[in-house]
């Protein structure tokens, strides 16, 4: 089965909201929401395909864009490669030139819309900030927590709590304090054994090269299920 190459866009307005479009009921994955874009023609550059599709679908001209993520996904009846770019500037007023409904949503609101399975990594990438903090090594716990608190107060939205010394009880205690500090203000990423997943449901998880695992395996640990 030939893989369909698609150029797609995460389009942001001046306030940071993201433009999504609803697929027609008659289309593949019809009725679900998606990030605008379309097929890359043979011999066509991805950036050129993206500009063409956004002009045809939305009536806008892209003036600033950068690569964001590539996603390969296999449906039972179709294989796709999504070449996703983040569009930060454009001219024209976006409208559904093909009759498709549009919506401007915040990154957090993306979770309220139903997307095709192939779009889920794009949703995750779109919700990540452009930069995030990785905590330094060698700091005493009070100093580290004060630094994290200051970063959150200054608008940092994602923090990775480094664990250079291994996953010992001291790191676990620090993680508990860090979760409380970030609650409702920033996303926290932890490192640790998968047995901890269910104890830190609000945190993200940084998986190292030494922890190869499937999504099913992660879900089993998170829900305490047996494989």
Model-derived regions, located:
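Conserved N-terminal beta-strand and adjoining loop/helix that marks the start
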Residues: 1-18, 39, 70
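Active-site-adjacent beta-strand/loop module that shapes the phosphate/pyrophosphate-binding cleft
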Residues: 13, 71-93
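Conserved Nudix-box catalytic region and its N-terminal flanking loop in Nudix hydrolases
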Residues: 17-60, 68-69, 187
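NUDIX/MutT-family hydrolases
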Residues: 84-86, 94-127
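Conserved N-terminal beta1-alpha1 strand-loop-helix module at the mouth
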Residues: 124-203
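Short hydrophobic/aromatic-enriched beta-strand-loop microsegments
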Residues: 203-211, 219
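Conserved small/polar residues in nucleotide/adenosyl-binding loops
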Residues: 216-223
